[in-house]
Amino acid sequence: MATIGRRAYAEMFGPTAGDRLRLADTDLVVEVEADYTLRAGSYGEEVKFGGGKTIRDGMAQSQKTRAEGAMDTVMTNALIMDHWGIVKADIGLKGGRIAVIGKAGNPDTQPGVDMIIGPGTEIISCEGMIVTAGGIDSHIHFICPQQIEEALTSGVTTMLGGGTGPATGTFATTCTPGPWNIERMLQAADAFPMNLGFLGKGNASLPAALHEQINAGVIGLKLHEDWGTTPAAISNCLDVAEETDTQVAIHSDTLNESGFVENTIAATKGRTLCAFHTEGAGGGHAPDILRVVGEQNFLPSSTNPTMPYTVNTLDEHVDMLMVCHHLDAGIAEDLAFAESRIRKETIAAEDILHDLGAISMFSSDSQAMGRVGEVIIRTWQTAHKMKQQRGKLPGDSDRHDNFRAKRYISKYTINPAIAHGISHEVGSVEPGKWADLVVWKPAFFGIKPSVILKGGFIAMAAMGDPNASIPTPQPVHYRPMFGGFGGAIAKGSLTFVSQAGLNADIQKRFGLAKTLSAVKNIRGVRKQHMIHNDYAPKMEVDAQTYLVRADGLLLTCEPAVSLPMTQRYFLF
């Protein structure tokens, strides 16, 4: 039997089991754990499209119709990177969802075929490419609609949060308050190739105004200190969430006016909620909001400006905070409020808590102390910095960083999906899930994706001059594709709503075009359900020195002086 070398094989069909590759210009290396395309029994039955290649009539392309099982699209020889594994496989898409992960081809001429390529099957060649689930950003201030395109080009395909545009309340808080505003935002969602879900305002001491927002379709409620996150408001909001199977997100009381972190924890009575910017620079009880990392009912996340900790982090935060929270630098009390939230000791500890799997999620805090297009970049920069400073994680080897890669990718894919009750639809590369997939060249991984699919159809891509004779000539930049136009928008993306809203027929009442999907199974979620990120240590924060300990271990690290995934990728 004729053979070829591993390098030649990888260049032709992409890496196979045992091959390794570097993620962008980081120190992170992943190794292919398995090759599902070998279900044919051995090498030699790979499928590939092109002149003189195998996906031709009577070869790897069968005569089967769609009704007989042929896929709508097959992504060939992809390197899937997800929380469950790092594997080589073909990916079959059908009806906007992931249908099969395995071996594609023609069952009439090839053994071990899991998915059928037919005359009606499109091919996306992924040889040498990484495929991930679309990212989920669960802390969005919907300040301007242009955020959505920015996020999509970064590899984010689901945005959850609140707001009504550049209103003062939205600058500071992720709330879409009241049924009228909620209706308008749900109607606006139809225009974008992005899965969207909205949070109502949760700050109220009586339930009626909260129920009317959930009945209007919000997926949860946001408690924000700028609206008064008192123990009474916390308890009432969680009462309503428990009754409606919706989530609560909390930005707690930085000034400790209505109570301390102990009072907030007590007010939850063990009921589940999401703790945004758990370190506290983005807001929350000063200086010890990090204590909630050790609570099973708090699902902790970080917003990206503090991640990772660098020599520039502290300097940019005071001005950022003054603008976002409508503060006046000429008022001493406002300046003191801002400075109380910026603590190098807790920011340094935040990096390590992510590496330990104690903080479970990443998000942006878009335009409100966060950068909407940098969730994925900063996740992997943090992973790189922690490998440099802390070395290998248990479970990794001298050959690879697979466990660290799975831990960090889970922070912006499966874990926010679980936390917000949408993991039945999105958050991973698994059969049955909505086909929101991102294709990356390894050298550009986490920075600039090549192709972004929404519901199995290409919605955004790095594309060259439309007047050129081929697709690749400069200027190459992100351009909306056909999945981002016309009726394809509504067919390719979901709007997440409450079950109460679905029951109230908001689709018809509000005249919504997108498919509505109800959030579910939220109230039983605990920290232990955060994949690869379920560590709940006993947290201690010294009120005088701000030093942080987890299970007695002092958490401190140096700020990074330089980072990968930065200037060399953004010359233009």
Swiss-Prot record:
A molecular function (GO) term: urease activity
Primary localization class, coarse: cytoplasm
Assembly and interaction partners: Heterotrimer of UreA (gamma), UreB (beta) and UreC (alpha) subunits. Three heterotrimers associate to form the active enzyme.
Domain of life: Bacteria
Cofactor: Ni cation
Free-text remark on how the cofactor is bound: Binds 2 nickel ions per subunit.
Chain sites annotated for binding substrate: H224
Protein name: Urease subunit alpha
Any one Gene Ontology cellular component term annotated for this protein: cytoplasm
Keywords from the named record: Cytoplasm, Hydrolase, Metal-binding, Nickel
GO biological process, any: urea catabolic process
PTM entry text: Carboxylation allows a single lysine to coordinate two nickel ions.
Pfam families according to UniProt: Amidohydro_1, Urease_alpha
Catalytic activity, reaction form: urea + 2 H2O + H(+) = hydrogencarbonate + 2 NH4(+)
Cellular compartments annotated: Cytoplasm
Keyword Hydrolase among UniProt keywords: yes
Organism: Polaromonas sp. (strain JS666 / ATCC BAA-500)
Domain Urease: 134-572
EC primary class: hydrolase
Residues the entry annotates as binding Ni(2+) 2: K222, H251, H277
EC number(s) recorded for this UniProt protein: 3.5.1.5
Pathway(s) the chain acts in: Nitrogen metabolism; urea degradation; CO(2) and NH(3) from urea (urease route): step 1/1
Residue sites binding Ni(2+) 1 per the record: H139, H141, K222, D365
